[in-house]
Amino acid sequence: MPPHELAALGAAACWAVTGILSQAAAQALGPFGFNRLRQGMVALMLAAIVLVAGRWHGIAAEDLWRLALSGVIGIFLGDTVLYVTLIRLGPRRSGALFALNAPMAALMGWLALGEELSAAAILGVVLSTAGVALAVLGRAGRAGTHRFEAVQGSVWVAVGLGLVAAAGQALGSLI
C-alpha cells in the first residue's frame, strides 16, 4: 500500500479513536476545561518539536492578527462547541456533523472570497451534506442502546451546535 494511503487510513483511525476517547474526558472536565487541557498539551508538543528541530519558522508580523483570529474562531470557539456537541450527540453523530467543515469552507470561500466551484465540487458538497444528514438523523427516531448513541437533550439543538462547530472550523481555516 502506498505511503499516502497508509497516512490517510492512519489519520482516519486517529480521528475515530479521538472522538471515542474524548467523550468521557469532555464530560468529566466540561467543554472549556477539556479544550484548555488539550491546547496545553498541543503547546507542549509544539515546544518539544521546535526544541528538537532547533528552529521556528517566522510568521510575518502583519499576519499575526489573522493567525490569532483564526485560532480563536476555529480552535477555541469551534472546538469548544464541538465538545458540547460530542457530549450531547456522541462521537458518531458529532464526528459526522463536524465533517461538514469542508463543504462549509468551500461555500464560504465561494460566497466571501469569490472562489469558483466546479460542478464536481458542488456535487461533492451536496453528497457530503446528504450523507451527514443520513448519518446524524437516520437513527434519531430509534432509541440508542449504546452510550455512544444516547442523545442528551434535543437532537435539533445538538445538531445546531454541531453546525456552529463545523462553521467555526471552516471560517477559521479560511482566515
Q: Whereabouts are the PLM-identified features?
A:
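Structural motif at transmembrane-helix junctions in multi-pass transporters
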Residues: Q27-G33, T80-L97
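Residue-level hotspots within transmembrane alpha-helices of multi-pass secondary transporters
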Residues: I20, L51, T80, A106-L107, ...
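Hydrophobic core positions of alpha-helical segments in small-molecule transporters
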Residues: G10, L37-R38, S70, L97-L100, ...
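Small-residue-rich packing faces within the transmembrane alpha-helices of Major Facilitator Superfamily
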Residues: A16, G40-L44, M104, T129
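Glycine-/small-residue-enriched transmembrane alpha-helix faces in small-molecule transporters
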Residues: M1-G33, L44, H146-I175
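Loop-to-transmembrane-helix transition segments
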Residues: P3-A11, L46-L51, H57-V81, F98, ...
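Loop-to-transmembrane alpha-helix entry segments
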Residues: H4, H57-E62, F98, A105, ...
